[in-house]
Amino acid sequence: LGDVYKRQKYTNKDWFVGAKSVLGSNLTQASGLGGFGVKSVNERTGEQKYTPIRFSSSWLNVVYGQKWKPGVFVGYAKNLGTSDELYAPDGKAQLYGTGTNLDQLVTAGAELTYNVPHWKFGLEYTLSSAWYGSLNTSSGKIKDTHAVCNNRIVAVAMFMF
């Protein structure tokens, strides 16, 4: 299966709505989550064959207004495991990539910006929760997860010319 993505955007005088969904394998080449793992090793030559880690992610962003612009953002990413069983003769599989021990990630945020000619002032709060765990070598999925949360507040003053 190749990478599949869908992006939608709607704008008018008062509204901006944007959304994107991606389903793919080894999305690290596009700065995404994923990678690959060793699925077999030729015992005579040491040659390795690989299987990709599949990820799905989606997000939605909605902003309303002209001078005062409140907005919300939500996002979700899920590790779908590997296409094939991983090679793990000693119980430890070899994985290469980004977020290889991440099961899922949820992000939600709210923002408020004040916009006048050449200036934008804003405040944003974002909560992100990531579930990390250990690897199931038969499916490449993550099991025995625990959540880690992050709170972020960002203030901005931007001059546009």
Provide a role label for each language-model segment.
Residues 147-161:
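Outer-membrane beta-barrel "beta-signal"
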Residues 1-5:
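Short, small-residue-biased leader/transition segments that mark boundaries at the very start
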Residues 6-10, 58-64, 110-114, 123-125, ...:
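Residues on the lipid-exposed face of transmembrane beta-strands in outer-membrane beta-barrel proteins
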Residues 19-25, 72-78, 108-110, 123-127, ...:
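Transmembrane beta-barrel strands of outer-membrane/channel proteins
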Residues 9-35, 40, 64:
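Oxyanion-binding "anion nests"
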Residues 29-38, 43-45, 81-98, 102-103, ...:
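Outer-membrane beta-barrel translocator domains and adjoining extracellular loop/strand segments
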Residues 13-17, 56, 66-70, 117-119, ...:
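Outer-envelope beta-barrel architecture signal
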Residues 11, 50-55, 100-104, 113-115, ...:
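Short sequence motifs at beta-strands and strand-loop junctions characteristic
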